[in-house]
């Protein structure tokens, strides 16, 4: 996994602030491959609380860009009925 512990902590802190303490955040995509360089940060948000929608995602991306630097960050929800969300849950890594 190509995220530093501080980056993981920042992602989790922002996610908990926006989505609540029970949120689960999965990293998926190219950042899981240690042999690659660069790439965006692909996150899947899983929460039991009411779905927050696109505005919550925009807030989270804005806060992460401010705290982590200007990186490409993509966020999807686990409720999305898409192949990408299904693959992210299947192959992604839960951030702790």
Segments predicted by a language model, with ranges:
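Short glycine- and acidic-residue-rich catalytic loops of nucleotidyl-transferase/cyclase enzymes
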Residues: 41
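Catalytic core of pol beta-like nucleotidyltransferases
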Residues: 1-26, 32-38, 47-96
């Amino acid at each position: 996994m190509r995220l530093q512990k501080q980056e993981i902590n920042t992602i989790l802190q922002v996610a908990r602030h926006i989505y609540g303490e029970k949120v689960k955040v999965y990293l998926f995509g190219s950042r899981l491959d240690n042999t690659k360089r660069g790439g965006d940060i692909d996150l899947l948000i899983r929460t039991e609380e009411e779905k927050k929608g696109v505005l919550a995602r925009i807030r989270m991306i804005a806060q992460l860009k401010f705290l982590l630097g200007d990186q490409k960050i993509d966020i999807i929800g686990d409720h999305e009925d898409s192949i990408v969300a299904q693959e992210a849950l299947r192959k992604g890594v839960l951030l702790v």
